[in-house]
Amino acid sequence: LKGKPVAEIVNRDVELFIEDVCVKRRYSVSTHRQVVSAMKQFASFHPTCRIESLILERPKKSRFLPIVLSKQEVIDLLRNTRNIKHKAVLALLYSSGLRIGELLNLELNDIDVDRRQIFVRNGKGRKDRYVIMAESFRQLFHNYLMTYRPKRYFVEGPKPGVQYTAPSIRGFLKRACKLARINKKVTPHTLRHSYATHLLEQGVDLRYIQE
């Protein structure tokens, strides 16, 4: 606002400031929204501010359609993941719809193989829930346990009992996609979206998927 005293700032000054900061500098929608919110707070609480009824529109966040893998692409992805630990991680992300943080926090005693249940602690919204272990995952899970023998977590780093990391998962997922010749921008969350999409295609109730 070019050093203008707060008491002299009027609505038009704020509008021009927003335009200069956000539009001309091509800030992201999220940053634009933060600037608008900050200016509204400033106008509301500053004792000498003369701005009245400041109306600033927060730009709507862009809604991009999520990237989804086809069933064949999922098969190709897993076939090209040679390391059994990596394959177990990707298979569980897809077959259970877990978020990457939920998988990293998953402990062995949260997995009930006989009942095919996985207990997810502190999921989104800090809610606990159960997800079903796919029958097709059981043998891979057994082979993985026999090979790596993790101590506490479902997937661990080089040191026993220490959690694996998200960058490591993203790294081997990227390599597997390259080997499978999948040109989409695939992230661990893509596997979750793919899981939900494939359930919908099979006629599973949307409310069940959302839970």
Positions of PLM-derived features:
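Conserved catalytic core of the tyrosine transesterase superfamily
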Residues: 1-211
